[in-house]
Amino acid sequence: MKKIVLILFITLASCSSPKDYNIKTVSVKEFRDFINDTGYITSAEEYGWSFVQENVYDYKVVNGANWMKPDGINVSIDSLPVTQVSYKDAIEYCKWAGVELPTYEKYWELVSSDDRLIVSNNMYPISSVKSVNIVGNVWDITEPGNSDQVRLAGGSLFCSIDTCHGTQEDRELYVDKETGNIHIGFSILTE
């Protein structure tokens, strides 16, 4: 008697489609909720100072500058993008919120479909997160992968066509993982 062996190959296909992400700027209020919930101390708070950009070319070190008082004097407004945060701070927020930072490439892929006003040409003050395109409002920290340097995306209110060209995708600006500034914030990937 012959035995017939039937081999059945089953190909499993994923039932879910690739994630459809959006990008969203983290506001002062959202960051405050994180701080209140965790007691986290930011890099700027730890150091007791941070950089405050005065214009596209000049900055100064200001004691007491942090996410609550980005210029060291005035209290942050809840609807504005959180600033004076470092990559380390952004990562801790992401862990708490269960979200991720975009890579530089993903950032530009997602912001290209936002048709709201791009802030540039030295528009001051920083605009509310809901009223403008995130490009050009504050620099956004992106996920650097294995690099020790963090590439900033999007440009800031200090950028213009005559200066840093920050709102152009091919612009390269890097900071270390502990640097904050009055015009550096972060955006997250959302589903």
Q: What are the language-model segments listed below?
A:
Residues 1-2, 175:
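N-terminal secretion targeting segments of exported proteins
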Residues 3-13:
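Sec-dependent N-terminal signal peptides
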Residues 15-18, 26-34, 61, 79-88, ...:
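Disulfide-stabilized, aromatic/cysteine-rich ligand-recognition loop
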Residues 16-38, 62-115, 120-132:
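Short aromatic-cysteine micro-motif
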Residues 37-42, 141:
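Phosphate/oxyanion-binding loops and surfaces in catalytic or ligand/nucleic-acid-binding neighborhoods
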Residues 43-71, 153-160:
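Core domains of carbohydrate- and sulfate-ester-processing enzymes
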Residues 140-146:
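Short beta->alpha transition motifs characteristic of CBS
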